[in-house]
């Protein structure tokens, strides 16, 4: 598949006649959701016209509707641009921390980002919970590669993470 000057090669397993079907015996992380979206874009850009379905434990379900090949290539092209940016400088997309921020600020009904003080404070709290983790769950801040980029998480660093996360994950 050629997109934005890049030849994409690989396997897209378990393609059904009516689209892609996946299942996971767990809850879905933001990184896994991003992988599903990427597979869906490749499927649609390659001429597939079915939907993308994912079934999760506890009656969870995700569905991506079919996209026209041109629209899928457009979205894929944006992700490739992000990849290229990340090849020349660190692209600070932390899927779980940035995703926690976005889940709090994004209003799906109105397709808008909320930026009132109350929502932003909740988003900061959710971001820090995902970044720092707790006794049961390791936070993204424990990653040694992130620790090499910054010693302490400052408000400026948090902003530098939120902006590309919004662009890439939303």
What residue ranges belong to the model's regions?
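Structural signature of nuclease core domains in nucleic-acid processing machines
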Residues: 1-170
């Amino acid at each position: 598949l050629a997109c934005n000057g890049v030849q994409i090669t690989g396997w897209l397993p378990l393609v059904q006649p009516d689209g892609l079907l996946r299942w996971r015996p767990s809850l879905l992380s933001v990184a896994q959701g991003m992988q599903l979206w990427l597979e869906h874009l490749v499927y649609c850009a390659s001429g597939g016209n079915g939907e993308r379905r994912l079934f999760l434990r506890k009656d969870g379900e995700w569905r991506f509707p079919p996209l026209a090949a041109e629209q899928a290539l457009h979205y894929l092209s944006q992700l490739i641009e992000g990849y290229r940016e990340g090849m020349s400088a660190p692209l600070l997309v932390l899927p779980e921390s940035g995703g926690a921020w976005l889940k709090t600020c994004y209003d799906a009904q109105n397709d808008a980002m909320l930026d009132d003080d109350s929502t932003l404070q909740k988003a900061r709290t959710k971001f820090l919970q995902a970044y720092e983790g707790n006794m049961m769950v390791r936070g993204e801040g424990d990653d040694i590669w992130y620790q090499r980029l910054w010693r302490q998480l400052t408000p400026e660093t948090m902003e530098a993470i939120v902006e590309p996360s919004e662009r890439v994950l939303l």
